[in-house]
A protein has these predicted regions:
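Low-complexity, acidic Ser/Thr/Pro/Gly-rich terminal tails and inter-domain linkers that flank the onset
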Residues: 20-49
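Single-pass alpha-helical membrane anchors
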Residues: 1-22
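Asparagine-centered strand-capping/turn motif at beta-strand->loop junctions
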Residues: 56-65
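Hydrophobic beta-strand positions in extracellular immunoglobulin-like domains
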Residues: 58, 77, 109-111, 145
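Intrinsically disordered, low-complexity Pro/Gly/Ser/Thr-rich segments with frequent PxxP/GP/PP motifs
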Residues: 81-122
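Terminal connector regions
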Residues: 113-168
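Short, hydrophobic/aromatic beta-strand segments
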Residues: 64-72
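Hydrophobic core residues within well-ordered beta-strands of beta-rich domains
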Residues: 50-52, 71, 103, 139
Length: 168
């Protein structure tokens, strides 16, 4: 037997293992479902940053855990003057979605008052002063999630609730 034969056999085994892993990743990409279910003002306190909460439901139909390595979502509200980006969600940790499970997770996004656009700031100022204000009932979210070996775009309209969960 030639000295190269074990290496060729080892290379073949490594190739089979790689292709098997690749097949699992492709399968996982086809079996991951997500839905941004809603956006709500979470914290509304003058002495602290405004906080928006974004709920995302993940469903993993694959037989392996899926690890989401990056998630990036811009949140837009449609005011009378047009659509305005109010926040960007970018969690710093990976998210593990266990095999064959559904998981709804809340993500909080802090926004400094000075970083709000003029229209949103005016609406919040009116609200602080006790005036009636009109708020959008839906938000537009745009971004992507990246997992092991694949990227899924996010682009949808979701319900928005301007009633803060935590307030002064």
């Amino acid at each position: 037997m030639s000295p190269a034969v074990p290496f060729i056999l080892l290379g073949g085994a490594a190739l089979v293992a790689y292709l098997s892993t690749l097949k699992k990743v492709v399968n996982a990409a086809q079996r991951l479902r997500y839905q941004v279910t809603r956006v709500q003002i979470y914290r509304f306190k003058l002495d602290r940053p405004l906080v928006f909460r974004v709920w995302i439901e993940f469903t993993n139909l694959a037989d392996i855990d899926i690890i989401i390595q990056a998630l990036y979502i811009d949140i837009f509200l449609d005011f009378a003057t047009g659509q305005q980006r109010i926040a960007t969600l970018y969690p710093q940790q990976s998210i593990v979605i266990p095999a064959n499970q559904r998981k709804e997770l809340p993500f909080d996004v802090e926004v400094k008052w000075v970083n709000l656009g003029a229209t949103a700031f005016q609406m919040l100022l009116k609200r602080i002063n006790g005036e009636e204000t009109w708020w959008p009932t839906s938000a537009h979210v745009d971004g992507e999630l990246k997992a092991e070996g694949f990227t899924i775009p996010i682009n949808m309209d979701v319900p928005f609730n301007a009633q803060p969960i935590e307030k002064e």
